[in-house]
Amino acid sequence: HNKKLLFFCGSGNNGGDGLAIARLLLKERGNVAIYILKTGSRSIDCELNLHRLMELQALVHEIETADNFPEIDGEDVVIEALFGTGLSKPLEGMAQMLVQYMNESEATVVSIDMPAGLFADTSSKDCTVIKATHTLSFECPKLAFMMTENGEYIGNISILDIGLHKKYCEESITDTYSIDHESVQPFFKPRKAFSHKYNFGHALL
């Protein structure tokens, strides 16, 4: 609870999510530092959440050069909300430098929806990607989370419900599916304490 929280936000909707989280935590516990990577015009969502944050007289720093990088202590917690699932090309320039800088720190890194530098549905091999300790992703796992080469970047994954209509998710077209405990649970029937293994069929591997 006493750890300093450093938010690094982009200018898109993922950055807007980061600013919204920063606002809630600022009201809850303080000790929050907020940095926005200047990468072009801000999305409407980002602008809205920045405005709400400024109403709290929050101090927001813009990062334009490496000289604007803050000191990151090993005891700090970095919340990264730079690009999310909207990334379409490998990181370069100031974004790449910032991610490399964060990777050199020993701080705990929490990525929002998708670690910066990671593509949502293709391999990011040989790209610069932030090494998240935790990834808080929204509504459903991303294909990138299933790729072996991405294991060192995603850390511990939590899938969060953000209120999207269940029907929207169910009707989304995809050729990729995952199996979890909840989806297979109906196949397992209650067993008596003294049952024999041959009472429950056979499995062919």
Language model regions located:
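Alpha-helix initiation/capping motif
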Residues: 42, 125-128, 192
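Small-residue (G/A/S/T)-rich helix-start motifs and N-terminal tracts that mark the onset
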Residues: 1-33, 145-205
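A cross-family phosphate/adenosyl-ligand binding-site feature
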Residues: 1-78, 83, 88-93, 97
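Structural beta-sheet core signal
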Residues: 7, 34-36, 111-113, 137, ...
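Short gly/ser/thr-rich secondary-structure transition/capping motifs
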Residues: 58-65, 92, 117-120, 183-189
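Internal gly/pro-rich beta-alpha loop/helix module
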Residues: 75-77, 82-84, 88-174
